[in-house]
Amino acid sequence: MKLFGTDGVRGKAGEFLDSFLAMRLAMAAGIYFKDKSVTNNILVGKDTRRSGYMIENAIVSGLTSIGYNVIQIGPMPTPAIAFLTEDMRCDAGIMISASHNPYYDNGIKFFDTHGNKLSEDIEKKIEEIYFDDKLIQASKVDMEKIGQAKRIDDVIGRYIVSIKNSFPKDLTLKSLRVVLDVAHGAAYKVAPTVFKELGAEVIVMSDKPNGLNINENCGALHPVNLATEVKRLRADVGFAFDGDADRLVVVDEKGEVANGDSLLGVLALYLKEQGKLQSSVVATIVSNGALKEFLNKHGIELDTCNVGDKYVLEKLKANGGNFGGEQSGHIIFSDYAKTGDGLIVALQFSALMLSKKKSASSILGQVKLYPQLLTNLKIAEKKDLDKIKGLKELKKDLENKNINTLFRYSGTENLIRLLLEAKDIKLLEKEMKNVVEFFKKALNG
């Protein structure tokens, strides 16, 4: 049984991800981190899901039972956990969140002592420990060595200072009217605070979490309401976060929702113009072909990697780069953060608007993207794609029609993601029907 997916362990709370799994997983991770322990402290944060209370208590039980002390900081963005784990010199950090998923899902993400997401090799080692009954039992400590847990409510200030330090000192947000959709999620306090302290006129949406409304018709996955408000209020720009605030969607002053690849392109160019861009930009294999053309036109190289912001960061480390991201809105400025941080991206885009004295639409309009169609097809089984009869011929036929293809399985669900890209949208729509029918027969019997 495999526990870890594309981004930590994730599943339906109370079913797959129940208190038993959370406690045992915390013990397994704690056993792994014990070998390199310095402070014997592990940081635990969460988003605003009601199930977070159950999972948090289970994690605390697991860690303290093997002798770890736990620092609980309550609802905070995922990037805040990455930052604070290193800043507070903890052995590791744990974030309880299912990111953009509905409230009934939850997840557990781990960070090492430097605030980095774990490699697949480390995740595999933790899985091996999880299934080793003897090792789990042997790790329990005597009564006098049981760890302690304490809750700290004032660490938000440290994170706010770090975020504000990413914004240019010679700029102010005083001339900007900004609408923030915080998705009833982890950024509901910190995002408005940061923008207000930097001088912006701030209108906040979806900032009343009740444990069940996170991401519900709001936030980065549902920016249509934000777009309506931006137009109605004649705001300069709108920013939509997801439940744990590690991704960002931008809405321009016309109410148009920006594609993440457009955002990547203009921010990369902004960094280059400032002399701050190191090496090549990193994007994922699903990035739009027009992004590469835009970057190359401006003398910027593009490297690609698998989907997942931890793979973006790994590629950045390998090529000596400091900027990259995903079409979905996970964007990494590694000079400022170890993971995607929606707040940092929002501030950098605001700085770009202010420094250029241009509207959001005129800036984002520089990148002319090609049409893409994505279908998430539910499937009965995940067969080896290389062994599916007729697939090679299908891809060759599409290639001959100047259609780029990417077919890949979801890391967490029984889905295959079918991506087609071409200059002709009508051709795409026609061919997508054929592709869907092909995979329905191949993977659903």
UniProtKB/Swiss-Prot annotation:
Alphabetized PROSITE patterns for the sequence: PGM_PMM
GO molecular-function terms, A-Z: magnesium ion binding; phosphoglucosamine mutase activity; phosphomannomutase activity
Binding-site residues, Mg(2+): 99, 242, 244, 246
GO CC annotation, single: cytosol
Keyword DNA-binding found: no
CDD domains in UniProt: GlmM
PTM statement from Swiss-Prot or TrEMBL: Activated by phosphorylation.
Residues bearing PTM Phosphoserine: 99
Gene Ontology terms describing biological process: carbohydrate metabolic process; peptidoglycan biosynthetic process; UDP-N-acetylglucosamine biosynthetic process
Keywords annotated in UniProt: Isomerase, Magnesium, Metal-binding, Phosphoprotein
Cofactor requirements of the protein: Mg(2+)
Catalysed conversion reaction: alpha-D-glucosamine 1-phosphate = D-glucosamine 6-phosphate
Enzyme active site: 99
Cofactor, how bound (note): Binds 1 Mg(2+) ion per subunit.
EC number: 5.4.2.10
Pfam families (UniProt xref): PGM_PMM_I, PGM_PMM_II, PGM_PMM_III, PGM_PMM_IV
Record's keyword annotation contains Transport: no
Primary role: Catalyzes the conversion of glucosamine-6-phosphate to glucosamine-1-phosphate.
Family: Belongs to the phosphohexose mutase family.
Record-linked NCBIfam families: glmM, PRK10887.1
Name by which UniProt lists this protein: Phosphoglucosamine mutase
Organism: Campylobacter jejuni subsp. doylei (strain ATCC BAA-1458 / RM4099 / 269.97)
Lineage, broadest ranks: Bacteria, Pseudomonadati, Campylobacterota, Epsilonproteobacteria, Campylobacterales
Gene name for this UniProt entry: glmM
